[in-house]
Amino acid sequence: MTDVLRSLVRKISFNNSDNLQLKHKTSIQSNTALEKKKRKPDTIKKVSDVQVHHTVPNFNNSSEYINDIENLIISKLIDGGKEGIAVDHIEHANISDSKTDGKVANKHENISSKLSKEKVEKMINFDYRYIKTKERTIHKRVYKHDRKTDVDRKNHGGTIDISYPTTEVVGHGSFGVVVTTVIIETNQKVAIKKVLQDRRYKNRELETMKMLCHPNTVGLQYYFYEKDEEDEVYLNLVLDYMPQSLYQRLRHFVNLKMQMPRVEIKFYAYQLFKALNYLHNVPRICHRDIKPQNLLVDPTTFSFKICDFGSAKCLKPDQPNVSYICSRYYRAPELMFGATNYSNQVDVWSSACVIAELLLGKPLFSGESGIDQLVEIIKIMGIPTKDEISGMNPNYEDHVFPNIKPITLAEIFKAEDPDTLDLLTKTLKYHPCERLVPLQCLLSSYFDETKRCDTDTYVKAQNLRIFDFDVETELGHVPLVERPAIEERLKHFVSAPSSSL
């Protein structure tokens, strides 16, 4: 990439204060302090905004928290009293259902109310009632959502009728259940997510999905409500169907003791950043739970969609947010330092962790707790500088960490090409202001292989149309005078491996 183009990209990305509040220093506020503030609830409010299966760190006592980190660093990173740690001392936890939240849709506490095991079983049986009564077809009156115009027929007082065969439960967890079926009227396969609806609030995931219209985000087709015999209300989201999650795809190769093809990883990564570029700039939404289980793929076409918007939120600089968000292995360091005015860049960190996991076949950072997760990051990334610590939490800047020699990303990914290392290095940064934004990631030469006209990948790229951008929406945040150079780079195809800008 030319110096001029780099300058343009940096300028448009870091001067756009509406897109990212990068000029604002990350501010920290304890969760306890936030709870004491008397604020009116949001119009769209979730019952729970935290993942309840982890212990929340005590950010209120910063000295105690930072001392725990220092003690763990001393015990885990100082080998035999000597500075430094050998590369072969890295021990990533094996991927398992218990550590990585299992198969697709196994753990989605952020979607809605956390449900008991008995409640989930009841929801599953509630869907099976059609089978028990030998009904072959289910008929529902639903609200049809029009993605292009961002309206649904409920707003106009109208509904439509759909029918589908008895469903098959393909996933369930503390959030509810997911089933697959085929809409008879359209002959289209869909996934239906059923969650318990709290009557007091709007469902944030539903309201978020009404805002989305992008090929790399799972689409909302219909939604409807139904009651059980105890008069409890369930929201059903009828969504685009995808064959499997990225987690399941990775497990396929891990079980075969094979690596996922590098070009396949690049296709998924490109579409991930393309989706984030859209989310962060059009509806201005931060997903806040990017992980392999929430990324859906079709391996036959390399198509890709982000799902599960139960944690998604429009981040505003004047409104604090909970810091205990996002699954642990993919949680940005500022969140572990208790940041409440964080930016959309938490999604970029999570995305980099996903790419690294696809390359390694296991999580890059796999801590056993929140503090241990931070130690795992320090083990590889090194001790954060005073400025980086201040950017994550000013309360910690006077603490001095033990001096250790980190295991670098270059050591871990030494078998990968320089472009891969370059992208990971520039997205895995302690300070969110220093991370590439999604558009910068899309311009990386890491993706040039997917644009080569002399390979089979060119056909897949053309079929997916992943290099087609809607200028008014996906590039609408780019200043007019700078768009031509950006568009040229995004659509530039190369004919040989050595060719790059």
Curated annotation (Swiss-Prot):
Signal peptide: none annotated. It comes from the Eukaryota. CDD domains: STKc_GSK3 (cd14137). GO terms for cellular component: cytoplasm; nucleus. Disulfide bonds: none annotated. Keywords: ATP-binding, Kinase, Nucleotide-binding, Phosphoprotein, Serine/threonine-protein kinase, Transferase. Its EC number is 2.7.11.1. InterPro entries: GSK-3, Kinase-like_dom_sf, Prot_kinase_dom, Protein_kinase_ATP_BS, Ser/Thr_kinase_AS, STKc_GSK3. SMART domains: S_TKc. Residues 164-447 form the Protein kinase domain. SUPFAM superfamilies: Protein kinase-like (PK-like). GO terms for biological process: cell differentiation; regulation of protein catabolic process; signal transduction. PROSITE patterns: PROTEIN_KINASE_ATP, PROTEIN_KINASE_DOM, PROTEIN_KINASE_ST. GO terms for molecular function: ATP binding; protein serine kinase activity; protein serine/threonine kinase activity; protein serine/threonine/tyrosine kinase activity. Belongs to the protein kinase superfamily. CMGC Ser/Thr protein kinase family. GSK-3 subfamily. This is Serine/threonine-protein kinase MRK1. It comes from Saccharomyces cerevisiae (strain ATCC 204508 / S288c) (Baker's yeast). The gene is MRK1.
